[in-house]
Structure formats: structure tokens, C-alpha cells
């Protein structure tokens, strides 16, 4: 029973076509308190159209409305406040949730369309820092949300395993490296060399020339350069996979930049065939002036390829392999201009899926307000943050519930979940200043708070034993239950909104809202009292548990049954 559609239809009939149904639906509001109804329609925008005072319009509409679907409709100033039939609405909502289970909110809007998601994409020979968290968890959550909306996401970890940085790294290793040191501690040593290179090249510009020469050798298949590159790549991947395992994130492909090296010639040839390449100071560029963009540099004057050259090859490969319905790049906001250029080049080339390319930008993670940087050596390792979070979660759980049977497993779920949820509750374009202790609080808008709310619901159900659950909403008389039921009914709309906006925070904020309404209900109601309403109250608790768990799953967070 979609009351938004019912309200929209009733108003549409009363307005006799003066507003479209979409216009009406967009104006509907959820009152902040239940005494003002369950849905409200403001009449301000109709005042100019009808040349009447909003209060008079509200009165006239109230008289014309078919009110049979509502408990009552009240006029309060310029607002029409709709009160739903609580019994019917509650029964249908609970029945829908409990029948569907984890599939509640599922839709087939995507019709199975493929959606490659370029995500995570760390650079080889650099550790995964907190700066890599956002693309990884945002991309993973978007993939889950897309699946819930009927799409087929392909999670593509487009590793940064090629580029001029490898010339710098090989140069640094040849100058200052030691094989035994690297084998003993690969990533930390490689980072040490990389940071040293950038410190020393300030006074020694010839280092950049050497680095460029080593990268040219790598591109030309030089045996020593390739062996060093492969070694750096293998060592890095092992560390990356350890972090992904902690996060519970998997990928469908790890096709890094190097995978596309043999596809670059075709890119250049297509650009030439379409007369898109023009020479500029010895380099080859694509003129994008008609898009009000700077030229896209495709080949340097020495013939070396650039990042965009490989990204064009990647987009062509994905287009031919997946025939995507959407083509997503979960990359930081600082790359917005670059993705405008990439999309424009693909459109000029006539790539079929070019129009469906969407950059999904996100803000920075800072610590003490400062940006993280591998070059400057300002790195906070993601693996260490996750381990520290699990350790703090274990201490908190041991204090709150020392007899918990599976404390280590729950600490892992809570500690990692706190970091993931702490990121995803923020609108993705916002910057985040990271404070670990804030993420781990069991009260407030945190992952542990939502997880604890789910565990509380599961605890109630265990204590209830084998009581038969009923979805007869007429039997729930608690006023706090009504807010919880309305929140449960919102979930399918939140799933759609999160998909339309590629915004996991929609789900995270919804989970917080549901947890809050449930905990308010829990505080005001004696749920396990053995009376006629017990089966209906348990149905509500079961529905809350189901939807909280599914909300957390969409975010890539686990929901422990006990905490």
C-alpha cells in the first residue's frame, strides 16, 4: 500500500489536472510530528496559479477530496494533513516485509543491465592508506544498491600498475634499494624509496630524466624493467588483498592499466581515422573547445602514452565487453574536470556508451584537517586503522558483554563496520575529517549504534521463544510503533533514491532513522508482555531486524545477532 501514490491520486482528482501527478508527489512532505499527520501537502505554489490565498485553497481541496482511504484529513493553515488508516497500513507493511524478508525493497528497474564500476584502484608499490577507503567502500555499496535495483554491476579494480611513477620507483630502487630489505618489508621499503625520490629531485632535476628513461624502457619491454615492475606489482597485490579481505570487499576483475597497453595503438588509430588528433607543440591532442574544455593530451612529444590514453582504451574494452547500461567511475572530486574531458573524447569517437559515462565524485578524507599524501610521507595505513578499530571494539564489547561467546568475530564485524559506516553516512561529496574514536561510539549516528539496534531486536526475538508472529497491525496500540512502521514502509523508496543518486548515505541515514524510531519504541513499550498484542509486537521487531540487517548489507557492513 503506497500511501504516497494514494495521496497523490486523491489530490490529482481534486485539482482536476491543474498539477501533474509528478508535481504533486514532489511537493508532499513528511510532518516532523505524528500529531500533524502522516503526510502533508502545502498549497503555497498553487496561490499564484489559482489567484487565491493558500489557506482558502487548502479548505477548498479538503472539501473536494475523496477521503475514504484515510483515517482523516485536516486543514492547518495552508497545509492539508493526511492521517493514514493505521491498522490497514501497519498490517500491510509488516506483511510485506516479513513475506519478502531480505528481498524487501528489491525492484527490477535495472532490467539486468551491466554497470561496470571503476573503483578502489590503488597504485602499485604504494600502501593502501585512508585515502583509498572512500572509493573502495562507496563503490562496493553502490554495487550492492545497483543489484537491489535490478542491475548487474561489474566491480572493476582498475589498478594503477603503469605510468611514470614506475620510472621513478625503479630509479629510486636502483640508486638506494636493497633486494633483501624489499623482500623483508616490500611496501614500506618501496614507499621509503618513493618518498626519498621526491625529496631529492627538488635539488636534482636529472632524477626526473632518469625516471622518464626507465619508464620508456618499461614501455618498450626491457627485461630488467619488466621484472622489477612485476615484483613490485605482486608484492603490492598481496597487501591489497589482505585489506580487501578485512573490509569484506571482492572484485569481478583486477584489470589494471598495464592490461590495456596492447590496446593503445588502436585508440590512436581510431582518433587518427576520425581526424580527431591534432599536433600541439609536438604532442598529439584532441580539440575539445566545442565542449568548453581544454585539449585532451593523448601522446606526449616523445610518443609516450598518458593516463587518458589508457582510460580511453579501458572505456572501449568495457563498451565492447559489457555493453553497459551505465558506466561508473568512483573517483575523487579533484578529477571532475578530467572525466569531463574523457567523456567528451569518447563522445567524439562515437563510443556507444559514452553518454552513459558518469563520474561519481567524493570528497577528501583528512586527518586534523590535512590532506594525506604518499609523496610527502603523510600516510595513515588503512590496514592499521582497521586493526586499531577492531582492537577498540573488542575492548568495548569485553566491557559491555564479557560473556559473549564469539567476541573476536563480533569485534571484527563492529570494528570494520564502524569505519565503513562512518564513511558512508556522509554525503559522498563532503570532505571527512577522520577521528577513530567518534566512529566507534555505541550511541549516536554510528555503525555500532545501528548494529546494536539490530542485535537488540534479535535478542528480543530469542527471548520470545516460539511465540507465533502475526502481522495484524490492528493489534498494535503503541503510538511509538506507528513511527517505526512508517519508517519501515519508506525502505523501498530509499533503495530507489540511493540508486538514482549513487548515494550510499541515503541508506546509512535511513538505517540510523530506523534504529532511532525502534529504540524509542523499545524504551516506551513492554514488548514481551504476554497479552493479545504480543504476536503483533514481535512481528514489528522481526521486521525491524530484517530491514536493519539489509540496510547494513547494502553498505557492506555486517549485522551481528549478539553484541
UniProtKB/Swiss-Prot annotation:
Catalytic activity entry: tRNA(Arg) + L-arginine + ATP = L-arginyl-tRNA(Arg) + AMP + diphosphate
EC number: 6.1.1.19
A Pfam short name: DALR_1
UniProt keyword annotation of ATP-binding present: yes
Chief location of this protein within or outside the cell: cytoplasm
Localization in the cell: Cytoplasm
GO BP terms, alphabetized: arginyl-tRNA aminoacylation
Keyword Lyase annotated: no
GO cellular component, one term: cytoplasm
Gene Ontology molecular function: arginine-tRNA ligase activity; ATP binding
Motif ('HIGH' region): 122-132
Keywords: Aminoacyl-tRNA synthetase, ATP-binding, Cytoplasm, Ligase, Nucleotide-binding, Protein biosynthesis
NCBIfam families membership: argS
Family stated for the protein in its record: Belongs to the class-I aminoacyl-tRNA synthetase family.
Subunit-level organization: Monomer.
Record protein name field: Arginine--tRNA ligase
Amino acid at each position: 500500500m503506497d500511501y504516497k501514490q494514494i495521496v497523490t491520486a486523491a489530490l490529482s482528482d481534486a485539482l482536476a489536472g491543474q498539477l501533474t501527478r509528478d508535481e504533486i508527489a514532489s511537493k508532499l512532505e513528511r510532518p516532523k510530528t505524528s500529531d500533524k499527520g502522516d503526510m502533508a501537502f502545502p498549497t503555497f505554489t498553487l496561490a499564484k496559479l489559482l489567484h487565491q490565498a493558500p489557506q482558502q485553497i487548502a479548505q477548498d481541496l479538503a472539501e473536494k477530496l475523496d477521503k475514504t482511504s484515510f483515517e482523516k484529513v485536516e486543514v492547518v493553515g495552508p497545509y492539508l494533513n493526511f492521517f493514514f488508516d493505521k491498522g490497514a497500513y501497519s498490517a500491510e507493511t509488516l506483511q510485506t516485509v516479513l513475506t519478502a524478508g531480505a528481498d524487501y525493497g528489491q525492484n527490477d528497474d535495472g532490467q539486468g543491465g551491466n554497470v561496470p564500476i571503476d573503483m578502489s584502484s590503488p597504485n602499485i608499490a604504494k600502501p593502501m592508506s585512508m585515502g583509498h577507503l572512500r572509493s573502495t567502500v562507496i563503490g562496493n555499496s553502490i554495487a550492492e544498491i545497483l543489484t537491489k535495483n535490478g542491475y548487474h554491476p561489474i566491480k572493476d579494480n582498475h589498478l594503477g600498475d603503469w605510468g611514470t611513477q614506475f620510472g621513478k620507483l625503479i630509479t629510486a630502487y636502483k640508486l638506494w634499494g636493497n633486494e633483501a630489505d624489499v623482500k623483508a618489508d616490500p611496501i614500506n621499503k618501496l614507499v621509503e624509496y618513493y618518498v626519498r625520490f621526491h625529496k631529492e629531485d627538488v635539488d636534482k632535476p636529472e632524477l626526473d630524466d632518469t625516471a622518464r628513461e626507465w619508464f620508456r624502457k618499461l614501455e618498450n619491454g626491457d627485461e630488467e624493467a619488466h621484472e622489477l615492475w612485476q615484483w613490485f606489482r605482486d608484492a603490492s597485490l598481496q597487501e591489497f588483498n589482505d585489506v580487501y579481505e578485512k573490509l569484506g570487499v571482492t572484485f569481478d576483475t583486477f584489470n589494471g592499466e598495464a592490461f590495456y597497453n596492447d590496446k593503445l595503438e588502436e585508440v590512436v588509430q581510431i582518433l587518427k581515422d576520425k581526424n580527431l588528433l591534432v599536433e600541439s607543440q609536438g604532442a598529439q591532442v584532441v580539440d575539445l573547445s566545442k565542449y568548453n574544455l581544454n585539449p585532451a593530451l593523448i601522446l606526449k612529444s616523445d610518443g609516450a602514452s598518458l593516463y587518458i590514453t589508457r582510460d580511453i582504451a579501458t572505456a572501449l574494452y568495457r563498451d565492447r565487453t559489457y555493453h553497459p547500461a551505465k558506466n561508473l567511475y568512483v573517483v575523487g572530486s579533484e578529477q571532475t574536470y578530467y572525466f569531463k574531458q574523457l567523456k567528451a573524447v569518447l563522445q567524439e569517437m562515437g563510443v556507444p556508451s559514452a553518454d552513459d559515462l558518469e563520474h561519481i565524485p567524493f570528497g577528501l578524507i583528512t586527518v586534523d584537517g590535512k590532506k594525506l599524501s604518499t609523496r610527502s610521507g603523510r600516510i595513515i595505513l588503512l590496514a592499521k586503522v582497521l586493526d586499531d578499530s577492531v582492537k577498540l571494539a573488542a575492548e568495548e564489547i569485553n566491557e559491555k558483554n564479557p560473556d559473549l561467546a564469539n567476541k573476536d568475530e563480533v569485534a571484527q564485524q563492529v570494528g570494520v563496520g564502524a569505519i565503513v559506516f562512518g564513511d558512508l553516512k556522509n554525503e559522498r561529496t563532503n570532505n571527512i575529517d577522520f577521528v577513530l574514536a567518534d566512529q566507534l561510539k555505541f550511541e549516536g549516528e554510528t555503525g555500532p549504534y545501528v548494529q546494536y539496534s539490530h542485535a537488540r531486536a534479535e535478542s528480543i526475538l530469542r527471548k520470545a521463544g516460539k511465540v507465533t508472529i502475526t502481522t495484524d497491525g490492528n493489534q498494535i496500540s503503541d503510538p511509538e510503533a506507528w513511527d517505526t512502521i512508517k519508517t519501515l514502509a519508506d525502505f523501498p523508496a530509499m533503495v530507489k533514491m540511493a540508486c538514482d543518486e549513487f548515494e550510499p548515505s541515503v541508506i546509512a541515514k535511513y538505517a540510523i532513522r530506523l534504529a532511532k524510531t525502534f529504540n524509542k519504541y523499545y524504551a516506551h513499550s513492554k514488548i514481551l508482555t504476554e497479552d493479545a498484542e504480543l504476536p503483533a509486537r514481535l512481528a514489528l521487531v522481526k521486521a525491524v531486524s530484517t530491514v536493519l540487517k539489509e540496510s547494513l548489507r547494502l553498505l557492506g557492513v555486517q549485522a551481528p545477532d549478539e553484541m
